[in-house]
A protein has these predicted regions:
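Active-site-adjacent beta-strand/loop module that shapes the phosphate/pyrophosphate-binding cleft
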Residues: 63-85, 99-103, 118-122
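Short connector loops at helix/strand junctions that flank enzyme active sites
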Residues: 6, 26, 53, 67-71, ...
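Nudix hydrolase/Nudix homology domain
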Residues: 21-24, 91-138
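A conserved beta-turn-beta hairpin within the catalytic core of GNAT-like acetyltransferases
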Residues: 19-22, 68
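Conserved N-terminal beta-strand and adjoining loop/helix that marks the start
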Residues: 1-11, 30
Length: 138
């Protein structure tokens, strides 16, 4: 699952290598035993970004066939914490930094134009099944 935090036209991203060939990604991860989706999102966001968040609406559910997982994207709102206070070993891929990046720069950072458009439009169709993860440009 991933969390999307947008503030003043800027989106929260991790600077880390990804399997998509870009060096920026959305924060998120996997559920641990006994966790709800909301608990997992709160934990992953804190570990990877240093921020406390309040989980919001489900944005999209997608298939991520190569990894044999269902990918869920949630909206989240910052409620506290310290940006960049990343927990050591928070991810299997080292996190080099955390930043709020202008949404308009998403394509320059390797995200698809489709994803940038969805963010800008406020995620039309939120809460729906979108098919493959590529359908939302991730």
């Amino acid at each position: 699952m991933t969390g999307v935090v947008v503030e003043d036209g800027r989106i929260l991203l991790l600077n880390q290598d990804t399997d998509a060939g870009r060096s920026w990604s959305l924060p998120g991860g996997k559920l641990e035993a006994g966790e709800t989706l909301a608990q997992a999102l709160v934990r992953e966001m804190k570990e990877e970004t240093g921020l406390d968040v309040l989980p919001g609406r489900l944005l999209y559910v997608c298939d991520h066939v190569p990894a044999e997982v269902v990918h869920m994207t949630f909206e989240a709102r910052r409620t506290g914490g310290t940006l960049g206070d990343v927990m050591a070993g928070a991810d299997t891929t080292p996190i080099r930094g955390v930043d709020f990046v202008p949404v308009a720069k998403l394509p320059e950072l390797g995200f698809s134009q489709r994803f940038a458009e969805l963010v800008t439009a406020g995620f039309p169709g939120a809460g729906s099944y979108m098919g493959p993860k590529s359908a939302i440009g991730l």
